[in-house]
């Protein structure tokens, strides 16, 4: 069961990766904008979660 689920997932990921590369070349601005927004949100969330870790570090 695990192997059956894993095979299509790998294929799907590979296909998406290939498409993403082509899309990225066509519209890098859009992808970059999305990436920046995602990173900002991710950093905000990480800051809240990692704050106690930072103090220990």
Curated annotation (Swiss-Prot):
GO terms for biological process: symbiont-mediated suppression of host cytoplasmic pattern recognition receptor signaling pathway via inhibition of MAVS activity. Keywords: Host cytoplasm, Host nucleus. One of its GO terms (cellular component) is membrane. The keyword Nucleotidyltransferase does not apply. Residues 1-35 are annotated as: Disordered. InterPro entries: Flu_proapoptotic_PB1-F2 (IPR021045). Residues 1-17 have a biased composition (Polar residues). Residues 18-34 have a biased composition (Basic and acidic residues). It is found in: Host nucleus; Host cytoplasm, Host cytosol. The keyword Methyltransferase does not apply. It comes from the Viruses. Is not encoded in all strains, and seems to be dispensable for replication. May play an important role in promoting lung pathology in both primary viral infection and secondary bacterial infection. Belongs to the influenza viruses PB1-F2 family. This is Protein PB1-F2. It comes from Influenza A virus (strain A/USA:Texas/UR06-0195/2007 H1N1). The lineage of its organism: Viruses, Riboviria, Orthornavirae, Negarnaviricota, Polyploviricotina. The gene is PB1.
């Amino acid at each position: 069961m695990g192997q059956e689920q894993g095979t299509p997932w790998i294929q799907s990921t590979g296909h998406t990766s290939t498409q993403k590369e082509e899309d990225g070349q066509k519209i890098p601005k859009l992808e970059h904008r999305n990436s920046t927004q995602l990173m900002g949100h991710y950093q905000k969330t990480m800051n809240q979660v990692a704050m106690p870790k930072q103090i220990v570090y």
